Every structure is written in structure tokens, then in C-alpha cells.
């Protein structure tokens, strides 16, 4: 797996997790779509997932455009059900989430927000 750090907004970063075997990817906290979209298109990446760690705009601002452009699935905490639009996959504390590419354990870390993972 390769991890690319993409600068978003003035002082935030998104992380693109890329399976080097097939170029499938998951973007974490796309605060805006433009820099993420540019990297994905320039590098012929197949965006499958958008993982949001919490509902603040500087972490979800790029969701809509990226979801619609790539038909990517949005993953987020079930506690952000009412705060993040169009969540496709709800995550809960302690859950092991996996597909044929990615696998991770969900850890709830409320404090910054109640739905923070």
C-alpha cells in the first residue's frame, strides 16, 4: 500500500491510500475535491472509497464531487449519520471493516466531535 499526502485548503491534508497492485484507492478526509481530483486523474487512480473521520467541513468538503465523479462509497461513523450527507457505509467502534482491498479497525475517539473515529 502506498500513502499519498494531499494538501487541501490552507492548512489541512487528505490522505490517499492506494493499492499498488490495481490502483484502487480510498481517500481520507477530502477537505476539498480539486487537489484530490487532480492527483487521482494525473495518476490514473480508481477511487473506491471516501473515509471521513468526522463531520467538519474541512474534512468532508470534497465528498460530493468525488462521490459523484467516481461513484465512490462514503464511510463514516454511525454517530455522524445526521451530519455527513450520503454516507453509504456506517462504521461503529470496534468494528473490523474490510473488502477485497482494504481492512481496518474502527476506533471511536470522541472529544473533538462525538462521531470522531
Regions found by a protein language model. Give the residues of each.
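Short acidic loop-to-beta-strand element that houses the catalytic metal-binding Asp/Glu
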Residues: 14-16, 96, 116-117
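Conserved beta-strand hairpin/beta-sheet module of binuclear metal-dependent hydrolase folds
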Residues: 1-46
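Generic hydrophobic segment detector
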Residues: 7, 74, 78, 116-117
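Active-site HxH/HxHxD metal-binding segment of metal-dependent hydrolases
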Residues: 25, 32-108
Amino acid at each position: 500500500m502506498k500513502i499519498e499526502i494531499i494538501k487541501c485548503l490552507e492548512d489541512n491534508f487528505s490522505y490517499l491510500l492506494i493499492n499498488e497492485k490495481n490502483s484502487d484507492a480510498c481517500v481520507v478526509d477530502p477537505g476539498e475535491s480539486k487537489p484530490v481530483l487532480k492527483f487521482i486523474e494525473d495518476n490514473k487512480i480508481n477511487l473506491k472509497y471516501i473515509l471521513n473521520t468526522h463531520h467538519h467541513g474541512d474534512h468532508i468538503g470534497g465528498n460530493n464531487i468525488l462521490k459523484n465523479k467516481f461513484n465512490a462509497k462514503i464511510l463514516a461513523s454511525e454517530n455522524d449519520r445526521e451530519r455527513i450527507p450520503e454516507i453509504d457505509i456506517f462504521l461503529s467502534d470496534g468494528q473490523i471493516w474490510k473488502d477485497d482491498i482494504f481492512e481496518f479497525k474502527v476506533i471511536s475517539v470522541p472529544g473533538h466531535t462525538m462521531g470522531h473515529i
